[in-house]
Each structure stands twice: as structure tokens, then as C-alpha cells.
Amino acid sequence: VIELVWAYIVVNKDRIAALEWKGIIHTDKALTRDFWYYTTPVLCASLVWGIAFVLYSVILGHMGSDAVAANSIASIVKSMVQCVIRGVSAGAGIIIGNLLGAGKLDKARKYGGRITRLSIAIGIITGLLLIVVAPVVSRAAPMSDTAKGYLGFMLIVLGLNLMGQSVNTTVLDGIFCAGGDAKFDMKGNIGAMWCFAVPLGFIAAFVFNAPVWLVYIIISLDELVKLPAVYIHYKKYIWVRNITR
């Protein structure tokens, strides 16, 4: 609520995108059509991603209370580190979208490369940071020794996974969406999560009763599995286009 009120004040004060009841009630049909055309794949991608993560929790829940406890703390630590990645992704979308909307396609393409390289560096830094603090966090966590062992391993896996996630999040959610190329994010989530991580995770946990460490690696590989496809699609430069009217 506080964030909503603050956003309303800033928007109307600086006239960035003034909110008017007339514009809310009487919408432009062409704009509404474009809005749903470009945002529906984003919503679907988020839905696919969210449900998959719920199923990850179901898989780990089958592995026992120690695995659940370790995953709970690992997820909190991961969310804290991800703030940096999400910030870069949001900034990338604004910068690239502004350039594309202004018709500066060559400059947008150049900046896209720079931002992608920046995301690689941030992924390496945040990933290594998470790996370094893994022993400290696992020792300080109020849980059983078995759960602490799981937690330390999970944080290391998450650190390695963040290196790929940084690039994927920046490119998919930032650069691609700025150019209206949001369908690939949905396809990537379906392929990496629903055709790989989720089914293999369920088979490993429920059919073969695999150890926690192996199951966790399987359900954490979705970002790395998706990375080559993201790079190939990025180099096609389909996202370098002006979608404004």
C-alpha cells in the first residue's frame, strides 16, 4: 500500500505518466490490443515459472523435513541475492526499451551487448559471494546437522545456478521484453522446467528415491539448461525492433 501511494505521488508530481480516470475508463482499442498481445506471453511465462517452483517444493517435501528446512533458508538467501539481478533486469528493460522506442536500433543492439556482459559479471560475483557465505550460513542456521549439510550444499548449487540465472533474467525479462520478444521466455520456461527439471525431479525423488543432493541438482539445472537457447535466440536479434505506433 505504501509503495502504491508513493508511486502515485511520484508519477503525478513529475508527470511521468499522469494517471487520469478518463484514460482508465475509456481505453484506446489499439493500445489495449497491443498491450495484451505483448503482455500475455509474459503472464504465461510467470505462471509456468510459478507453478513449477511450487512443484519443486512438493518434490523436496517428499525428501523429508531436513530437506524442507534447508530449502526454506536457501530460498531466503537466494531471494536476497537475486535483488541485484532483478534490478539489472529492470534497468535493462528501461534502457533498451527507450532506445528502441526512439528508433535507435543500432545503439540498442550495442547497449544490449554491454548489458549482457554486465549481467555475466554480476552473475559471477553474486554466485561466488553465495558460495563463499554458504559455510557461514549453514553453521549459523538453527537446524539439525543433517539439514545444515543440505543447506551448505544447496547454497553452493544456487551460487553456480545464479551465474546462469543472471544472464537469463536480464536477457529474457529485460532485453527481450523491451523489444516485444516475450514469447521466447514462455517457451524457455516450458522447455527447461516442464520438459526437464519437473519431470526428472519427480522421477528421481518418487521413483528412484534418489538422494537429496542429486534431486536438488536436477531441479536447479533449469537455468543452465535454458542458457544456450537464450544465447542463440539473442544473437538472432529479433528483439531489435521498434514496437511503438
Q: What spans do the regions from the language model cover?
A:
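Helix-terminus/linker motif at the lipid-water interface of multi-pass membrane proteins
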Residues: 47-80, 98-99, 136-145, 207
